[in-house]
Amino acid sequence: MSEADEGGGGLRGFRNGYGRLLEVVVAALMIVLFAEVTLGVVFRAIGRSLIWYDEVASVLLAWLTFYGAALASVKRAHIGCPEVVDALSWRARRALNIVAELLVIAFFVLLGGVGASVLPVLATDALVSLPEIPMSVVQSVIPISAVLIVIAEMLHLVD
């Protein structure tokens, strides 16, 4: 067995490392979201509500969703119809997989492009409860996660 087959090098090694990086990002977002919501609940319980905690929690949940989608792309964990695909011949299955990958890549290239074009428009807007944080930072998750998903899908396409 070669080093590339064991996940230690080459494209498979890169994909495994890429997946681990996204796992760390998703885990960190989950920990921060948990801590932030817990902090908000504690402060509310003692009668000193934080005005920003629900808005930040919403942003963190959105980020978790987008970065989690990128992680799911790396792990091939999105919902599919394997029974239908498995009923096809190997050649038809391969062709269908390639077409599906290309459609997903095209969609996320479009989403990333549109998401990036919106960022300058949002540069002057900010979170309501934290005006120091521009909406462009909040919404940057869209083009960033689109690029991450395109990378993941391209890794599977060349596999």
What do the PLM-derived regions correspond to, one by one?
Residues 1-159:
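Alpha-helical transmembrane segments and membrane-interface helix-loop junctions
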